[in-house]
């Protein structure tokens, strides 16, 4: 078997590092062909030393210059590129077999679309592609004959629990024809699922990033605490699996052992289980339709004391309700909400606003943007820019 060339968009982040771990566990199968990051020179330098990619790219031009000099000094032949255009070109590189799309935020949008338009096999971990582009993105996957495989643990669990006919029609699954009655999206509920509501005003960034089950970046940890993460996943699931609101259900599962489920019309429920480790869904997408070693500890059923399930409380998780409502309102609303949330979470981490303010800023931002039908990527970027300014203004107020 010939080695697969993997381009990792976001190699210096949490998903990127886990992807490199899977590559390291399967050196005969995969090669880190190109690594892409933002401005983290040190991490990228270490990755280049270890994995010797053909290309390394940083979005920040000055950071790329420093990286290039460091690699030359250490006689590493990796070619260093800089800027958004170079990153988009790497995402569509003719020698790339698979693209891990894991750049967080709107910055990951254009490179992911570049990979799709090149007809690549795209391992999708960038939420914004579907949250902000939805129909545009799904249509592009079809029009350019790209292959889309979901990396998010929940969407990957749903993917594994669906019949092969659905797996081959991501974005266009005829769920009811295949006997699917419900897609059940599970979430841990974050670290504050039992915290009294009156204490929410005192929640600190340190408390919010301490996720009870998963090891994740700061932004996604806060999103998990507010359940915006689940809201974004709800939006993604609707697009990925062509699901109606009636075909979706969100439940809290504190142990994070069942990663999501599919309910069928005959009464069956198929669930995907495993230890909470992102290397499992990453390895599943990289090897699909086969399996490969991920380096993950096997699930020990005797150590699982219980599996519990709780109905979400929208008073506790207003961001979840907001995301569900935003999908119903349209693509402009999900785009504005996503951008506002990005700004609000960073402001919370920087101690400019309180934990409770995050959802308020998200809602107010949507309310200040006029309903609008998105027709192309420029429309998405325009709403993103508007929402960014509105959210920043609200934070200053």
UniProtKB/Swiss-Prot annotation:
NADPH binds at residues 12-15, 38-40, 126, 128, 217. Keywords: Isoprene biosynthesis, Manganese, Metal-binding, NADP, Oxidoreductase. It is an enzyme of class 1 (oxidoreductase). It comes from the Bacteria. 1-deoxy-D-xylulose 5-phosphate binds at residues 127, 153-154, 188, 211, 224, 229-230, 233. Mn(2+) binds at residues 152, 154, 233. Pathway: Isoprenoid biosynthesis; isopentenyl diphosphate biosynthesis via DXP pathway; isopentenyl diphosphate from 1-deoxy-D-xylulose 5-phosphate: step 1/6. It catalyses: 2-C-methyl-D-erythritol 4-phosphate + NADP(+) = 1-deoxy-D-xylulose 5-phosphate + NADPH + H(+). GO terms for molecular function: 1-deoxy-D-xylulose-5-phosphate reductoisomerase activity; manganese ion binding; NADPH binding. Its EC number is 1.1.1.267. One of its GO terms (biological process) is isopentenyl diphosphate biosynthetic process, methylerythritol 4-phosphate pathway involved in terpenoid biosynthetic process. Its cofactor is Mg(2+); Mn(2+). Belongs to the DXR family. NCBIfam families: Dxr (TIGR00243), PRK05447.1-1 (NF003938), PRK12464.1 (NF009114). Catalyzes the NADPH-dependent rearrangement and reduction of 1-deoxy-D-xylulose-5-phosphate (DXP) to 2-C-methyl-D-erythritol 4-phosphate (MEP). PANTHER family: 1-DEOXY-D-XYLULOSE 5-PHOSPHATE REDUCTOISOMERASE (PTHR30525), 1-DEOXY-D-XYLULOSE 5-PHOSPHATE REDUCTOISOMERASE, CHLOROPLASTIC (PTHR30525:SF0). This is 1-deoxy-D-xylulose 5-phosphate reductoisomerase. It comes from Haemophilus influenzae (strain PittEE). The gene is dxr.
């Amino acid at each position: 078997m010939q080695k697969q060339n993997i381009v990792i968009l976001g190699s210096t982040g949490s998903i990127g590092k886990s992807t490199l771990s899977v590559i390291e566990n399967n050196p005969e199968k995969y090669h880190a062909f190109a690594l892409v990051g933002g401005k983290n020179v040190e991490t990228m330098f270490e990755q280049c030393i270890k994995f010797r990619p053909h290309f390394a790219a940083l979005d920040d031009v000055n950071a790329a210059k420093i990286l290039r000099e460091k690699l030359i000094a250490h006689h590493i032949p990796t070619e260093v590129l800089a800027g958004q255009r170079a990153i988009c070109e790497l995402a569509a590189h003719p020698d790339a077999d698979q693209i891990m799309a894991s750049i967080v935020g709107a910055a990951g949008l254009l490179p992911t679309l570049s990979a799709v338009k090149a007809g690549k096999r795209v391992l999708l971990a960038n939420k914004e592609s579907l949250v902000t582009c939805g129909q545009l993105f799904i249509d592009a996957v079809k029009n350019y004959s790209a292959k889309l495989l979901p990396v998010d643990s929940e969407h990957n669990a749903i993917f594994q629990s669906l019949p092969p006919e659905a797996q081959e029609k991501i974005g266009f699954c005829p769920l009811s024809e295949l006997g699917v009655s419900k897609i059940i999206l599970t979430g841990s509920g974050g670290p504050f699922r039992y915290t009294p509501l009156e204490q929410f005003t005192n929640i600190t960034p340190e408390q919010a990033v301490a996720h009870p089950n998963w090891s994740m970046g700061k932004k996604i940890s806060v999103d998990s605490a507010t359940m915006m993460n689940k809201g974004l996943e709800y939006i993604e699931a609707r697009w990925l699996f062509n699901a109606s609101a009636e075909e979706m259900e969100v439940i809290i599962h504190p142990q994070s052992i069942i990663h999501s489920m599919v309910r069928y019309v005959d009464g069956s429920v198929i669930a995907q289980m495993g230890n909470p480790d992102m290397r499992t869904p990453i390895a599943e997408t990289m090897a699909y339709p086969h399996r490969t070693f991920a380096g993950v500890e096997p699930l020990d059923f005797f150590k699982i004391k219980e599996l519990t399930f709780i109905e979400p409380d929208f008073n506790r998780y207003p961001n979840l309700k907001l995301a569900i409502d935003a999908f119903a309102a349209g693509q402009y609303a999900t785009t504005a909400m996503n951008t506002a949330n990005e700004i609000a979470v960073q402001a919370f981490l920087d101690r400019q606003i309180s934990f409770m303010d995050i959802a308020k800023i998200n809602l107010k931002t949507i309310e200040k943007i006029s309903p609008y039908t998105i027709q192309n990527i420029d429309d998405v970027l325009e709403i993103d820019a508007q929402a960014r300014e509105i959210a920043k203004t609200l934070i200053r107020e």
